[in-house]
UniProtKB/Swiss-Prot annotation:
GO cellular component: cytoplasm
Protein's cellular compartments: Cytoplasm
Name of the protein in question: tRNA(Ile)-lysidine synthase
Enzyme nomenclature, EC number: 6.3.4.19
Species of origin: Protochlamydia amoebophila (strain UWE25)
Gene from which the chain derives: tilS
Amino acid sequence: MSCICLKNEKLNVINQVKRFIKKYCKSTQPLLLALSGGADSLSLFYCLLACRLEGILSFHVAHVDHGWREESAKEATILKNLAEQHQVPYHQLKIDLSQLAGNLEDACRKQRQKFFKEICLQNNLQAVCLGHQENDQVETVLKRILEGSHWSHFDGLKERMWHDQVQFLRPLLGIQKDEILAFLKGNQLKAFEDGTNCDERFMRARMRRTIIPDLNRSFGKKIDNSLVYIASEMSELKNFFLGRVSPLLGQIVKGPFGVYLNLANHPSIDLVEIKYLLRLISEQELFFLSRQILQRASEAIEKLEPQLSFEMGTKKIVIDRGHFFILSKKTACKNPNLQISGSSLQYYGKWMIKTNESFYHQNLQASTWLDGWRGYLKTYLPLDKYVLGQASKHAKLLRHHSTINKWWSSHHVPPFLRSFFPVIWQHNEIAHEFLTGLERQNLQEGEKCLQIELSYLT
């Protein structure tokens, strides 16, 4: 790993990386290279050196010592010396496996991502470069197909992606492993060898050493190009569907209780689009749906079915006549009654209650359940004493013949929401409910009134 003059005879690795960097990167900001010392990341290190030499851009190096192998500490020192030799800023993280719990691979991945993000923010770096190449793409796509993943995941690894406000780039994704090894050999560069890459106890090793070679022999040709083609086609299809549902994604309402989307007013949306949309929203909210639930939920939305729900862990999906909810927690209103009058600031569970005297204007509107979903409710009542509390199904509305439950049903208030928000009582009847936005108090323009505001504290 000494300082050498790179050769590029009949090899296009450097030129492909240069084209990639010019396509996606700004020359004014450095990159961060995740350097393990393996063949892929080492070749990328020297390609980025070539880019720096031509003034295309500069870069930093980040190495993570997982401590999985005895030689890892020695390798970290070698990489540190390599970076210093070429005057490349070097950053290192040593992971203490004894401090991690649960799935070690997942825990280490989160540690790496956190480490990379910190370096990028501290040094104003534009992206993290990863060493994945075409063979990694082939293995990823085949694995997802065999696992029965959703088709939207068949696009495999991305050349460019964002995660947790950090951009990740894969300049080698269109280059085969053989080309990378030839590049290293032609320049007399020796990479570290990770024994786990050949250990068939690991799925990746079995894919590389047994499954894919066996498929090649069985088909009588290499399947690599076919799988890369599938990834490309699925990427185009995914972008098409994303374009179709993007306007709906912009209509999502998020609040302290979860996520809401009204699909009742979009009769032209197809079932396959609904399925993709629900999966996309659910994955963004870390609420992963089984195939059966996804199919049933999508059909319920398409048919505008009432009151369907699914519970998974601490979250819950509710579908009601085309309205789609993901609830983040149980939020039924079970607080003791609260006396309200005059100007005051009080608390009703997680609701902050602010009351003050004001003057009524006809252009003032009371809140609806959608406002409540966002965590804010407001209304205006005649000056008097009231009680804030939970509604009961058979309670009567003040100056109205209907029960509260019939009133809400006639105005299509989703049943599960009715226990989320308090009502205002007076003389054992409900003086105001917040879910329909309808006023029944006959306040006159300019009349002095009691303004009541509820804000949900998260």
